[in-house]
């Protein structure tokens, strides 16, 4: 589970940049 956190965090960060 914790190994997926970096990928999710990166995905959220990229979405925030688009806003």
From Swiss-Prot:
It comes from the Eukaryota. One of its GO terms (cellular component) is extracellular region. Expressed by the skin glands. It is found in: Secreted. Its main location: secreted. The keyword Cytoplasm does not apply. The modification Leucine amide is found at residue 19. Keywords: Amidation, Amphibian defense peptide, Antimicrobial, Cytolysis, Fungicide, Hemolysis, Immunity, Innate immunity, Secreted. GO terms for biological process: defense response to fungus; innate immune response; killing of cells of another organism. Belongs to the frog skin active peptide (FSAP) family. Phylloseptin subfamily. This is Phylloseptin-3.2TR. It comes from Phyllomedusa trinitatis.
């Amino acid at each position: 589970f914790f190994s997926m956190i970096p990928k999710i965090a990166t995905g959220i960060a990229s979405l925030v940049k688009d806003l």
